[in-house]
Amino acid sequence: MSDDDDKIYIYSDLFSKNFSDDEKDDSYEREKQVYSGSETQNAENEYSKLRAQNSTILNNYFDNDNIKNVENLKSNDPDQIDLILFPVNKNYYMNLFDGQLIENIHSIKLRKAGFYAIYVENNNNSKWDGIYFGLSRMQVELDYKLITKKNKDGGEYEKRNTSSYDNTESVQNTVGSEKEETENKNEETSNYNSNLNNEINKICKYNLDQTDILLDDSNSERRRNSKFKIKNTNYYDNLMLQNKYTNSILYDDDDDKNNTETYTCTFKTEDQIRVPSQKKKYIYLYNKYDNATLDLNVHTYMSLGMSILCKYSLLYCGKYNHIPRDPYTPFKKPVSILSLDGGGILTISTLLVLNRLEAELRKEIGSDDIKLIDCFDMVCGTSAGGLISLALLREIDLQDVSNMWPSTIKKVFEGNRNIISGIFFEGYDVNNVKDVFLERMGNKFMSSYKKFYCFVTATDVKHKPYKLFLIRNYTHKYNSINAESYDGINKVPLWLAAWATASAPTYLKGPSAEDIKKLGINIKPEIHLVDGALKASNPALIALEECARLNNKNLSTFIKEDLDTLVSIGTGQVPTKLTQSGASSKSASTFEILINSTHLLTRANDTHREVLQRLADRENTYFRFNVPHIGDIEIDSQDVRDFDLISKATQDYLFDEKFYEIKRLAHKLANNYIRSKYL
């Protein structure tokens, strides 16, 4: 045994070792040398404290080489931090880092306004988590801060890096002079933009005045002009809001001020997240302005100086669209609606009906490029029907949806679950199911899709009595007339909407207020969402009421004046009776949901009868497809024989009972499509 092996190191000896070459060049180490001669108190001085913080000895203990990834460390000097541009050339995904992490600092210029997601994955071997005897875990910690032009102009901008610089005074003077110069430029730009906006408003006002003069020849024209003026002046005032931070004149980005929604959705501009070993997390943020800056500081937490294998990325999740763009004319033509019932695996029947209808439509028009979804102004769904609606909103082809559907539904309802196991093991495999929704639906937000109006139903069990909650891609300017105004939100990613609408109690725990907050999304009042089938297994009537509300008309007037076609597809499913009666201070459990849901379930056929009565005077308007003899099949069945039974029963139904109705509907949709495109 060598002398070195015989030597016993004590705490003070460890910190009296000579510095390595790297440490001599390190400003942090030089600062520690200043304190190395300070008086010792309780066997510990300032020098030992600082050196313990850096944990370089443990690095040398576990590995002969310094395991810090020096290439990925950014300088403390803000001028030396590389500015990353994102997105670039329609590349909406960027892998920022994948490897052994100690500490990385990034400054990213977000070139587009819209929603973003930060993804962090900790691939550390969990065996190291026992180093603290189970009291804590080695984690990846990420601090982020979104800095917009508004923050900079207001003088609120500060760099996240809090490390000391060698020449603090000179740096402060430099920053101060640069700040004064920047403020002067910003003031000039702001004045220029304000003057420009005033000039544009004067021009627009002059044009409106000239329109009044030209249309002043007759009383009838004057009346028409008066109506036009009242309508468009309000619309113009809302649209042409001055934005002191951009050169464009658009809607105010704070859309909550321009609608009647009671629920608000906000995002943090700075926060901190920690990811344990073998876990991954998403955090979402909303950038209102082009060319904002996102600062990231990613480092290990409670790792004793060891590096952690991880990766993290940045995703662009779509632009926020104001839907409808013109709230006074939400529909440019008579409205066609597609409504899809819930029903688990029974929605195989729904897809067969949709595919058959699309085939007939293409035959009528004579083109294989036409999509069925192009013929509808609103698409909605509940539970599994909601998943299909979201897939169509994402513009996935019907055939592709059909191909992936059995495996998707199987994963959502995976396992032999019953009411007992559902109550006591709620949330079983919820992370795996969330991964399925992420893979199938993606991270883009509902409001980033504007091809047609879309909503999926959910049930809010945070408040009693439980109530219907809609996840939409649009907002309402008006309240309903002589009807209920349904609550809802539109600033959520598609996968979260899918999780909410398909969270059938005893199968899948729905997203609670805490789950949503962990994603960086703050919804007020708080919500806890589960399967929409508890309130509306058939959303056809809800769709009619939503369209009437968008048009600012009562339901009867909308049906008489604006409705063209309503297509409702059922699943033959009679909902199983579960077992309702303020706000709950905690998330409702599966047991509470079951106990309080005896009278919540609405049968799909009851809704069908009510819609039929309301549309009795409208010929060739309402089309309902609901395959018989499949309602007794369990919605979570994994039996291939049940799949075959559903397929055969649906094919027989379409080619026997509904053969001519399919052709009649396809002919009507084809004529509507041709008129809207070419006439």
From Swiss-Prot:
One of its GO terms (biological process) is phosphatidylcholine catabolic process. The keyword Hydrolase applies. A motif (GXSXG) lies at residues 381-385. It holds the Pfam family Patatin. It is found in: Cytoplasm. Residues 35-45, 162-176 have a biased composition (Polar residues). InterPro entries: Acyl_Trfase/lysoPLipase, PNPLA_dom. GO terms for molecular function: phospholipase A2 activity. Its main location: cytoplasm. Disruption phenotype: Gametocyte maturation is delayed. No defect in exflagellation of male gametes, formation of macrogametes and zygotes following gametocyte activation. At the ring stage, levels of phosphatidylcholine are increased. Dispensable for asexual blood stage growth. Its EC number is 3.1.1.4. Residues 338-544 form the PNPLA domain. Residues 177-188 have a biased composition (Basic and acidic residues). The active site is at residues 383, 531. It catalyses: a 1,2-diacyl-sn-glycero-3-phosphocholine + H2O = a 1-acyl-sn-glycero-3-phosphocholine + a fatty acid + H(+); 1,2-dihexadecanoyl-sn-glycero-3-phosphocholine + H2O = 1-hexadecanoyl-sn-glycero-3-phosphocholine + hexadecanoate + H(+). Belongs to the patatin family. Hydrolyzes the ester bond of the fatty acyl group attached at the sn-2 position of phospholipids such as phosphatidylcholine. Involved in gametogenesis; however, it is not clear whether it is involved in gametocytes development in host erythrocytes or in gametocyte activation in the mosquito midgut. Involved in gametocyte development in host erythrocytes; however, not involved in gametocytes activation including male gamete exflagellation. PANTHER family: CALCIUM-INDEPENDENT PHOSPHOLIPASE A2-GAMMA. This is Patatin-like phospholipase 1.
